[in-house]
Amino acid sequence: MKQSNLCPDCARAALRLPRQAGRGAIWLYRHTLSPLVGYHCRHLPTCSVYGDEAIGRFGLWAGGWMTLARLLRCQPWGTSGIDNVPAEPPGGARWYLPWRYGRWRGVND
């Protein structure tokens, strides 16, 4: 039987697709809607930069939950100031407990 010539990096590329799709959505927001709405984020780095970095570092699932928590904190009664993406995911975070990925109040403990 003939052995097929499958791409050796196909599995790795397939696993990167969700991450690239999430980062692509953020890129699209930054270059279309954000200039129309205006730049007025309460945090540094901005929420879109935070989301791009979180998804790039932790993947779409964990980084997406971190970004959602950040977006919910970025409102008039929310937090403000310097709020970087954590270097590692929170200790109690699991894929089946996604809300534990986000920091829902406060900035950089």
From Swiss-Prot:
Membrane topology: Peripheral membrane protein
UniProt keyword annotation of Membrane present: yes
Subcellular location, record wording: Cell inner membrane
Key words of the record: Cell inner membrane, Cell membrane, Membrane
Top-level taxon: Bacteria
GO CC annotations on file: plasma membrane
InterPro entries from the UniProt entry: Membr_insert_effic_factor_YidD (IPR002696)
Protein family: Belongs to the UPF0161 family.
HAMAP family: UPF0161_YidD
Stated role: Could be involved in insertion of integral membrane proteins into the membrane.
The protein's name in its UniProt record: Putative membrane protein insertion efficiency factor
